[in-house]
């Protein structure tokens, strides 16, 4: 509202929930989450957890919708104890992973809304003697550089930030 009041041109990176009337560019993260559920299902996983960021952020809301769409498409039931939100840091990801893996029916795969949270799973898996990629599958979203140095490297949907920046600049000009 302030930018509009001052007639300052702007664009948004990401959609808003209130459908603000302004130019925006977004990458459809919800499609990635749906595809991730489908991929995990194709590998034999039926109990797939979702670790989300803060649900008040629109990207987190959309990624949750993609996860739920994937479950529904495959005939899998949502289990409330397999969906955690408010996970913003690697330490939060560690705590969320530990909670999920201590459930009476733990997931065999975990989908993370952000790479930062997913990186926390590596410590927990090591502590519990689980091999990521063999005994626990992980897919995440963002493509942060640190993911390439995890062992094994983090499976992630990499965001082309250069392309996003170019699109935003084109919208602004």
Which sequence ranges carry the predicted segments?
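Flexible loop/hinge segments that line or gate small-molecule binding clefts
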Residues: 1-35, 116, 142-154
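Alpha-helical structural signal in soluble globular domains
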Residues: 2, 6, 62-74, 99, ...
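Short beta-strand elements in bilobed, periplasmic/extracellular small-molecule ligand-binding domains
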Residues: 20, 68-94
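Hydrophobic alpha-helical segments within soluble ligand-binding/sensing domains
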Residues: 25-50, 65, 69, 90-99, ...
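Alpha-helix capping/helix-boundary segments
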Residues: 56, 63, 116-118
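Flexible loop/turn connectors
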Residues: 96-173
């Amino acid at each position: 509202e302030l930018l509009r009041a001052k007639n300052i041109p702007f664009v948004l990176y990401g959609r808003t929930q209130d459908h603000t009337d302004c130019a925006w560019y977004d990458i459809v993260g919800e499609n990635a989450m749906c595809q991730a559920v489908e991929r995990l299902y194709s590998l034999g996983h039926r109990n797939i957890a979702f670790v989300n960021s803060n649900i008040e952020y629109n990207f987190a809301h959309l990624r949750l919708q993609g996860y739920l769409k994937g479950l529904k498409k495959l005939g899998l039931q949502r289990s409330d104890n397999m969906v955690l939100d408010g996970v913003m840091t690697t330490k939060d990801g560690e705590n969320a992973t530990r909670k999920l893996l201590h459930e009476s029916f733990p997931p065999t795969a975990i989908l993370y809304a952000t790479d930062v949270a997913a990186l926390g799973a590596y410590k927990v898996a090591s502590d519990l003697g689980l091999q990521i990629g063999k005994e626990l599958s992980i897919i995440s979203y963002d493509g942060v550089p640190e993911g390439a140095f995890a062992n094994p490297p983090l499976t992630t949907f990499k965001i082309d930030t250069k392309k996003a920046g170019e699109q935003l600049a084109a919208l602004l000009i």
